[in-house]
Amino acid sequence: MSLNLSAEEQTAFDQLFKIADKQDIGVITGEEAVPFLEKSGLAPQVLGQIWQIADAENRGFLTFSGFVIAMRLVALAQEKLPFDYKKSGKIPYFADIHISGVDSSKFVQLNRPNNVSSGDGSDGSFLPPISSDEMTRYQQMFTTVCPTDGLMDGDRASSIFGRAPLSTEILARVWNLVDTHKRGALDIREFNTGMHIINLLLNGSLKSPPVSISPSFIASAASTSSVSAPSQYPGLSRSPPVQAPNIPVSDPWAIPSQDLTSFCQLFSNVDKAHKGYVSGSEAYSFFLASKLPEDVLAQIWDLSDTNSNGKLNIGEFCISLYLIKLKLSGKELPKVLPSSMLSSVAPLMQKSKSVPTSIPSVVPANISSPNPNPTLAPNPTGPSRVTSGTEDLLSLDATPFSPTLAPQHTSSNATKHSAPPVTKSAPFPVVSPLQLNHTPGFPTSPAAKPNSPTSTFFPQSSFGQTIAKNTMDKPSAVRTSVPSQLAAPIPQVASAEQLKLAAEVPKLESQLSQVKKSNDDLQKSSRDVAANLSDVKAKVSEIRKAYDEELAKAKQISLDIETNKAQTEQVNREYSILEATLNALQKQNKQKGEVLEQVVAESEAAKNMVESSNASIQQLKSEVADKEQTLAQLHLQLDEMTQRLVSLDEESKAVSQRKLDLEYKINNSKTQLATATEEYHEHSKQLEAEKQELSKLEDGLKSVNLTEEAPKPEVDSTPRFPSFTSNGITTDKPTLPDTTSSVPTQHNSFDAMHNTLRSPSLNSNNSSAHASTVSRNPFHNLKISGASSPVSNFWESEFASAVFPRSISKTTSLSVNNSSVNPSLDSEPVQLSNMEEPQHQDSSVVDVSTSASQRGSPVLSDLSKLTGSARNTAEPVENTSAEPIENTSAPTPFEIANKQQATEPISAPFATETISTPAPVKPPVPPSRRDRSAQDGVVQQATPHIQDEFPPIQFNEIDDDESSSDEEPPMSNLSPQISIGSVTNYTSAVTELPDPNHQLEMSTTTHVQHPNSETIPSSTENQYFDTTSGAFEANSNTEVTVNSNEVSQPFDFDTANESDNDDDELPVQQVVSGSLANDAFNVDDEFDNQFANLQAAEIKDDDNSSTDEEEHAGHH
């Protein structure tokens, strides 16, 4: 019966069948089915009903079709539905079994059965009851091991229990539980209980053996021990299965002992009649369950049937099952059975010989039978049909049989011969009705009917033909042996017996008459049967012919059906592929249509966006143009406001600087005023003393009569008189001889005071006390070169640009008298006023005049205050304009000399070389911090001074001879011009500096032009600040030309030190080449000459040189 399975059922049942078929032989035996079905949680009675329905043929095992029926019945029982297994339903639930690939909703929702013990209880009531199948199986095992007595000793029980794959500890606990009498042996109840516990442990129903078992459970384990097996296992209690011997396996073809035990159990299930062998019909259905081809099964049958008798005993059955197992595992079958395989089943073959086989017994016919003339009915014939392989196998035991009874011949002389009648010849043995009933394949009607026409059956399958060949060859021996038994001569009867027989003659005669009558009836019936037989033969031949034709047609139809099935399957596959392709194409077309619609919509949206974007762009362009125009206007306004802010800022800075200047001047003036006051008091005291001495000398002169005039003493032709400026600074103002007056020079004692008030000379005798010590003059580290040096001129320019921070015009000239420089000038600020550019501005020689004053000994203006001489007290008015203001006071001898010198050309060794410095000008830098590139003709940028190293020098203006003003004249009105013997013209724009410390942060970039006409460009963005307008103006770059011969002259330190310690004093007035100005300062003339000829010395100062290099790299 074929059942239509769903996909879920097919998947689930395949997995469950593989789990239940532990031996992997293609069928599920009763031993394997019991523990498997118990996991469903159903009662044993329900499982027994399910087994009877699934195993309808009562074969003792389940094929896959029977297993499917059992699974559906289990699912229906779990859902408590009627047993209708023809309809598909849910998948049954089995404890501890997981099935993959099936939805959980397809399973029966059933919890774990409660009747299965977990092994944790201490009472035996937790153990499930022993099913009848298990009880029968356990009883067979017990009776096999103990056939006589009712006890199983420990060795035999341990050998059986030890076959379970459990630990020794668990088996010992099981033994202690079931050995209730502690006698070292088990009866059938205890043995069944122990086997049941072991089975529960193996299938997972119990995790561990229980603590104790109730006596009632053990007593119920043997309640069915004397009852025969249930209907599905007929005859198991009558014939226990043969146990497989324990044969060591050393050869791959030898059958293992475990397999032999399993095969013997299967043999007992298949051999339901316990004949000791398995017929072809019984083996055929069992072998087909392995799903092997029929030709392979036929080969296995040929190898297993060692006796070629068409049936398999227990040893041959084990061989066939082992060969099936090897073939299923993928191994090839041997051509001939190996000796190791035969030796492994040899004990089973010997035991099978002692089992009687069912051979039909031959008995003589009973002559005195009350029914001597049985009626023979012909075998009915039906329509021909196609036989299957199973029918071929089932018909092997139905041997062709056509019994005929020969007529009996008795002695005519009944009185002389009294012997039982016998048949003379019989072609087939007479079989008893009992034997016929036990012969499979015979009809239920009487078989011993003579003249019964039968036809010989020829099986169609190769497997059936192989078995039929072996079976058809055997009955010939039996048929040939029967006549020999019937033809045996009857032994002679003794005389006594003859007398007895003679007494029975009348009786026998009467019987003879009856027999004759019966013979006549039989002959008549025989003739009738012969006539019927000819008719039947004719009909049989016709039917045989029709059968063969129909058989050929059936085969052809079968072939056509198979071909059509193959074609139909191919067409169905192609149809499935085409249908899937069509669905895929339709789906793709639909998707592409949707994408096309979406793309079209997006394209339309993009076009609209482009149009709106173009309109927005045009609008934005117009707005951008308006914004740009507005922005340009705003930029113009911003530039204008920026310029205004810059102007205001510069003006603010100028005012702040002016304020700081004034505060600084006020502080200096206060300090100088205090110093001058002290000096004034000292001079007053000295003057009083001198007056007293003078009065004494005058008194002495009056008393002395001079007869002749005293020689004229040699005094300084340029007497110096102390003078106090308006800010309290004392200055030395030379008094030049008046060429227009013939007033003789007065000789008084003020010259001594004047000499006393002079500053100590570098070469005077007053400094001899310090000759042995190291000079602290920073200029002693410089070397002296020739009469004139560009370095000295550069110092003059540096000091002029640093100490005169204000610039009225773009060009300011400064020339320092080399004979009036004092080291004390380094600590005083210098002021420089603007001068008008002379008419010969384009020439290389520019006349400069000076109006600076140096604090020192009293000058003429101060002396005039002391002596009470008249001075010009007119205060000059400060002029803030850019134009220079002329001095309204009378010209001084300095100015007269300078004006005369301005008209004459200057002849100097390097008068043709011009040094120009762009604005802004920064404070002076000592030679030790200058770059060493001066030897190459380039004056590098000076590094800033450290604080208080070289403070700026301040020069106060020189008052006029007739002036006695107490206030400082405005800086814009000063126009100092001093003529120097070797003059170098400097043209620079000076920037007003906020304070002395801030002046050190400024720097001056000087461009020097080498005699070889190598031009070095100056900074491209030099600017100077105009104090009158408060704005910066760009200064054009100029070139500076320096005589490299003069620059390269070394400085003589030895000469400088010797001249520093010299006691001789230079005269106050000194004439230099060209036009020389008078010395207005109280300093040494020799130092002035040295200062004019200074040259930078090569001094290795790592710190200063690194600073110079960094600053030089920053500017370049």
Curated annotation (Swiss-Prot):
Here the segments flagged for biased composition (Acidic residues) are: 957-969, 1055-1066, 1104-1116
Its subcellular locations are:
Cytoplasm, Cytoskeleton
Name the residue ranges with Polar residues bias: 401-416, 723-749, 864-890
Which GO molecular function entries does the Swiss-Prot or TrEMBL record give?
A: calcium ion binding
The Low complexity compositionally biased stretches are 755-774, 812-827
Query: Taxonomic lineage of this organism?
Result: Eukaryota, Fungi, Dikarya, Ascomycota, Taphrinomycotina
Region annotation (Disordered) maps to 360-454, 703-774, 812-890, 909-978, 1004-1024, 1044-1066, 1095-1116
Q: By its UniProt entry, which PROSITE patterns does this protein fall under?
A: EF_HAND_1, EF_HAND_2, EH
Keyword Cytoplasm in record: yes
Q: Does the keyword Cell wall biogenesis/degradation apply?
A: no
List the source organism: Schizosaccharomyces pombe (strain 972 / ATCC 24843) (Fission yeast)
A GO cellular component annotation in the UniProt record: cell cortex
Under the heading CDD domains, the entry gives: EH
Q: What are the Pro residues biased-composition ranges?
A: 371-381
The domain of life is: Eukaryota
All copies of domain EF-hand, residue ranges? 8-43, 42-77, 166-201, 292-327
Keywords, comma-separated and alphabetical: Calcium, Coiled coil, Cytoplasm, Cytoskeleton, Metal-binding, Repeat
Q: Which residues form the EH domain?
A: 9-106, 134-224, 259-348
Which GO biological process annotations does it have? actin cortical patch assembly; endocytosis; endosomal transport; intracellular protein transport
One Pfam match: EH
For this entry, the protein name equals: Uncharacterized calcium-binding protein C800.10c
Which residue positions does the secretion signal occupy? none
Coiled coil location: 565-707
The UniProt record gives the binding positions of Ca(2+) as: D305, N307, N309, K311, E316
